[in-house]
């Protein structure tokens, strides 16, 4: 059954999801978005679209209109789904981070998971936690490209079958906690310091990378932080970059080394709670 916190209506795409994935879905709390939340959305989108029109892959701007993403207001799931169904996809709201294997399985079923939260003003150019700007304005536009959406589905299909290790689960919980603390304005410096130390310790003691860890790395450096085209003059297509004006400007600087995307990328770890690249 869907999460009892909210009663949700499943559509033709999400009805095909395995029932054990329903527990991650929540009803988008649209009425809880404040005027400040809406202002944050408008500000980030206006800055991003104006900048990205010259440095992003062509499919980004085309996808903004195809998927019903407005610069003026936070999108509603119902509106997005009416448009996404035409390209065989759907969107669901989730509560922040979900486990990597669940994320991959949603993707394998052509379902885009969208965190219902929105970043605070403090993190307006970059957020350490998943939010609706990252998911809706970063991921959704690019999946309107047929070739890319099929790539994403296949990636999810393979990733959902990858084997995780106990260390992967520990890392997921540690990163989830750290991202929540960093985004919460009421968090103490001591709690953030302690959570950061926990993540750093785990990162240094992961041992041999599991299948899931390698898939997660591959996913991160393409779907989230991928560049495409000439390595000396690339275009942006990764959702993490498309939804972060700070990171999208940083990544194109000549001082940032651009690396070819190869199978070796599966060995390159990352810290989700820090701006990329770092």
Located regions from the model:
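The feature captures two recurrent sequence modes
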Residues: 1-191
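C-terminal structured domains
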Residues: 2-24, 239-278
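Glycine-rich, compositionally biased intrinsically disordered regions
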Residues: 75, 172, 189-191, 226, ...
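Short, hydrophobic/amphipathic alpha-helical patches that form generic packing surfaces
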Residues: 79-86, 153, 157, 213-228, ...
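Extended alpha-helical surfaces
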Residues: 88, 109-116, 128-143, 203, ...
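Short linear loop/turn motifs
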Residues: 98-101, 235-239
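Extended, Lys/Arg-enriched charged tracts that mediate electrostatic binding to polyanionic substrates
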Residues: 168, 172-180, 184-229, 238
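Extended, regular secondary-structure scaffolds
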Residues: 212, 230-231, 236, 250-251, ...
